[in-house]
């Protein structure tokens, strides 16, 4: 521990965000990183705990606590305090293939488990990680390192999201020949088209993919396995196949008038914006536009927040975000102690922007849609909303939301974005390979394994565990790589 009093000597200092007025004019990332000197002070705040929950990655109660990748957080915090940035990068890359992604989009499970955060402000772990990886690129440390020996084994990975990329990176470094198939026109999966550019600029993805290509990973875009390419062909040509297709099947809602024109899934809205932004700077009008419209977002999660922020950048007339459940408390309750993940209300960037642009929080709690209203041409023009109240089922003890009779009211709306989560992977891929799925429509495997019921076919990521975080997808990719390597070589050092 380089500075035992660091957490007392220095206050937490976060990267400064651009003003709302400035940042909504474009789709760029909007934080100014701390200087190296200031970041080193933040590293000094780490207490080097005897039991570092930040990196523990463990189940506590009904919640997960700490980093799923078991990042060596106290070690690289201490190293950056000492100015040893290269050594910090070397420790970081042992456990995390893509700190350039997680330092931008991870909700920082580590910080919520930080001991400093139990009675004060947590260490700026995510910002420290960002500083380490960006310094590595600036100093030429993050460069291609192709394996010196090849095993002669060939592996096909279907899907180039975070789990597929992590598996590809691990297995390629082991010396296997890896080909990644992606049905979209660009590599990245969820990272490319599911997360807006202002949270993760796509040049950051391309930068890492270029390194992976130099190291020998082959990428084939615009190839829809299960349709363009038969599963049997891949099974015949490759020693192992890993399915990393994500949980891309959006959850729909059953509401009267759902067929109205102007109702879209959030993922389609976000993808259309990012693709048009990258293709032509949003100049050809091919994307789903919120400009001048009253927008309603159904769903209160991260994707819903991204829809709010994107709609504001389009120039929406108004934005309303519906959440069925009651508002969470502002602080931890007695049954949600540290170091559990805090079940508290948070206001994310999109909601912050809506508050400043429209003068009020876009979120409406304990409310849902009862009916959509169309004009005589089938275009959406409004919705009937209804308020809800929580009721506990006496038999199961579960909380359900019931409509409050007579609480209906109408709102004007021309664009609805459904951000109600996902229901597993699209079935044509699983059917093509003949793999079994479970009741949640995730690919079925034995507990603790990534092997499917089909010989030589494995799975990882959201397709395996269900809708989750990027950091969990990376963990899944690393785990499946270890299992595949063991099956090919008879032992593994991954």
Placement of each model-derived feature along the sequence:
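C-terminal catalytic lobe of FAD-dependent flavoproteins
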Residues: 12-37, 42-45, 365-367, 373, ...
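Glycine-rich Rossmann-fold phosphate-binding loop(s) that bind the pyrophosphate
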Residues: 158-162, 299-301, 462
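Feature captures the FAD/FMN-dependent oxidoreductase FAD-binding
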Residues: 149, 154-158, 206-255, 370-385, ...
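Beta1-alpha1 glycine-rich phosphate/pyrophosphate-binding loop at the start
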Residues: 8-32, 41-44, 68-82, 91-92, ...
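A conserved FAD-binding loop/helix module that cradles the flavin
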Residues: 304-307, 314, 460-491
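Glycine-rich dinucleotide-binding loop and its adjacent helix/turn
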Residues: 131-149, 207-227, 250-314, 437-448, ...
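Ferredoxin-type iron-sulfur electron-transfer modules in oxidoreductases and energy-metabolism complexes
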Residues: 24-38, 64-65, 69-104, 108, ...
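FAD-site-proximal beta/loop scaffold in flavoenzymes
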Residues: 261-292, 392-467
């Amino acid at each position: 521990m380089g500075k035992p009093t660091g957490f007392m000597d220095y206050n937490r200092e976060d990267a400064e965000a651009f003003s709302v007025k400035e940042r909504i004019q474009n789709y760029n990332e909007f934080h100014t990183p701390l200087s190296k000197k200031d970041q080193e002070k933040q590293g000094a705040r780490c207490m080097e705990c005897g039991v570092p929950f930040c990196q523990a990655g463990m189940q506590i109660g009904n919640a997960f606590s700490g980093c799923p990748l078991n990042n060596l957080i106290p070690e690289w915090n201490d190293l950056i305090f000492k100015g040893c940035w290269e050594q910090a990068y070397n420790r970081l890359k042992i456990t995390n293939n893509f700190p350039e992604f997680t330092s931008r989009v991870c909700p920082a499970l580590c910080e919520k488990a930080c001991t400093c955060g139990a009675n004060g402000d947590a260490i700026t772990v995510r910002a420290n990680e960002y500083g380490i990886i960006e310094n590595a690129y600036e100093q030429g440390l993050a460069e291609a390192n192709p394996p010196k020996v090849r095993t002669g084994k060939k592996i096909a990975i279907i899907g180039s999201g975070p789990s597929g990329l992590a598996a590809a990176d691990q297995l390629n470094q082991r010396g296997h020949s890896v080909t990644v198939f992606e049905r979209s026109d660009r590599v990245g999966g969820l990272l490319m088209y599911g997360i807006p550019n202002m949270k993760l600029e796509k040049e950051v993805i391309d930068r890492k993919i270029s390194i992976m290509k130099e190291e020998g990973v082959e990428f084939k875009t615009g190839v829809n396995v299960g349709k363009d390419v038969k599963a049997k062909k891949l099974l015949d040509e490759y020693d192992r196949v890993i399915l990393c297709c994500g949980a891309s099947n959006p959850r729909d809602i059953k509401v009267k008038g759902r067929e109205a024109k102007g109702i879209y899934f959030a993922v389609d809205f976000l993808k259309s914006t990012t693709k048009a932004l990258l293709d032509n700077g949003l100049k050809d009008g091919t994307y789903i536009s919120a400009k001048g419209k009253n927008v309603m977002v159904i769903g209160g999660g991260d994707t819903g927040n991204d829809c709010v922020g994107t709609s504001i950048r389009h120039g929406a007339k108004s934005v309303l975000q519906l959440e069925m459940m009651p508002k969470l408390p502002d602080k931890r309750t007695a049954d949600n102690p540290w170091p559990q993940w805090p079940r508290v209300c948070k206001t994310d960037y999109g909601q912050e922007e809506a508050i400043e642009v429209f003068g009020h929080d876009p979120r409406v709690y304990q409310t849902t849609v009862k009916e959509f209203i169309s004009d005589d041409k089938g275009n959406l023009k409004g919705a009937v909303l209804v308020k809800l109240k929580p009721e506990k089922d006496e038999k199961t003890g579960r909380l359900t939301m019931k409509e409050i009779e007579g609480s209906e009211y109408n709102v004007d709306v021309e664009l609805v974005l459904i951000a109600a989560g996902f229901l597993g992977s699209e079935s044509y891929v699983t059917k093509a390979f003949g793999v079994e799925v479970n009741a949640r429509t995730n690919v079925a495997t034995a507990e603790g394994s990534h092997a499917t019921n089909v010989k030589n076919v494995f799975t990882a990521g959201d397709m395996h565990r269900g809708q989750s975080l990027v950091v969990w997808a990376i963990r899944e990719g690393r785990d499946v790589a270890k299992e595949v390597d063991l099956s090919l070589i008879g032992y593994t050092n991954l």
